[in-house]
Amino acid sequence: MVVVGSARIDERGNANWGKAGDQTSREVATEPYYKHRLGWYLLRPKEAAVARKIGLAMVEACLNHNIGYDQSERYGIINCLKKYGRIAKINEPTEADCSSLVRACCVQAGINVGDFNTSSEVSVLEKTGAFNKAVVVTNDTKLCAGDVLVTKIKGHTVIVTEGYPREDEKPTAKPKPDKAAGKAKKSIEEVAREIITGKWGNNPERTNKLIKAGYVPAEVQAVVNKLLK
């Protein structure tokens, strides 16, 4: 199944003036891919490694309930990314809209990109040189994690967080053993199984605990999802 993540709507179903942070756990969230009534353009990162970073950044945003939706405070996510260095580490209530969140994910992935909205997104992202030329999404399009989708006219933008494997994607290298002194760090699967049993508590506390323990919450959650299928 193809899954996309995005900043969607505030806690009252409005676009502006909501309370900072995700009040419903659905303001910034993942959902199954859907056909938009305005149609989608696809912007695919040229490098598989960059695509993976973009997709992971969006998962981090969807898991971090400090990030909510508000067009009037859309630059909050950008400012907090500069302050904390990573979306998963943002530790104060802030806001984003769909395009500023996509921008933040691209910045975290190492792409130098300025401001844009859904009207200018295609041209701005193409000019970075990090993406292939935009194409129209059809029924035959196989979407991959890290793909950026934006409506053909001003509307909405999302990032694919789960999808088909890229043809150029190499197998991920096995992680090196943790050389830190003391108790060995648990594997991601061990932690995922502990989360399922409730040992790590609930979000947002769980996310903070994972970060402090040296884990990337999005990677752990991906394993949790697989174990629960």
Language-model features, listed with the residues they occupy:
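Low-complexity, Gly/Ser/Thr/Pro-rich intrinsically disordered linker/tail segments
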Residues: P165-A181
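Repeat-associated, polar segments at repeat-unit boundaries in modular proteins
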Residues: K176, A213-K229
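Extracytoplasmic/secreted envelope proteins and their assembly/folding machinery
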Residues: A51, G55-V59, S99, R103, ...
